[in-house]
Swiss-Prot record:
Disulfide bonds: none
Native source organism of the sequence: Rhizobium fredii (Sinorhizobium fredii)
Molecular function GO labels: S-adenosylmethionine-dependent methyltransferase activity
Protein's job: SAM-utilizing methyltransferase involved in nod factor synthesis.
Protein name per the record: Nodulation protein S
Length: 175
């Protein structure tokens, strides 16, 4: 499940002017994903609910001037800016219930530009429930399919069943 810089470019097909990447400080992969995204966007906005996590990741990223760091909850973050790409990975299953996940999904979709893309990745529902979370990727994908068009999906099988996850790319309609 490794990716290289060329994999990122091939996946997205182009550079994105404005990118949003909500994070959750309990997930350890955040600096890696931001490091992979940063070269492909003119403006990267990173949000996390924990100030210390933002500070730590910001320090690792060497204060890149085109990255905007914001302490905020993914359910309440608000901006007039629309994003060309929103990357949500290993974030939503930390929320307390399906209603909170739905609120976050609705909020994120509202910030997606017309024809914008959303890449969503998470552990599968069965793994998330085994870990004590309310939902995983299949639940969120169903929510995203209510308002976005699913363009592609990739099932990632890990070394153990606990590592299985789904990645999906969605696009917002222009109408």
């Amino acid at each position: 499940m490794r990716s290289s810089r060329s994999d990122i470019r091939r996946c997205f097909g182009c550079r994105f002017p404005k990118v949003l990447s909500p994070t959750h400080s309990k997930s350890g992969a955040r600096p890696a994903i931001h490091g992979k995204l940063a070269p492909y966007c003119k403006r990267l906005t990173v949000i996390d609910v924990v100030p210390r996590a933002i500070a730590r990741t910001r320090q690792r990223m060497k204060e890149s001037s085109h990255i905007n760091w914001i302490v905020a909850d993914v359910r309440q973050f608000s901006t007039q800016q629309l994003f060309d790409l929103i990357v949500v990975a290993e974030v939503l299953y930390y929320l307390e219930d399906v209603a909170a996940i739905r609120t976050a999904v609705h909020n994120l979709v509202s910030m997606l530009a017309p024809s914008g893309h959303m890449v969503f990745g998470s552990a599968i529902d069965a793994n998330c429930r085994r870990w004590g979370h309310v939902a995983g990727t299949e639940t969120v994908i169903a929510m995203l399919n209510e308002t976005l068009i699913e363009v592609e999906q990739l099932y990632c099988r890990g070394a153990s069943v606990n590592e299985d996850c789904l990645l999906s790319r969605f696009q917002k309609s222009t109408t």
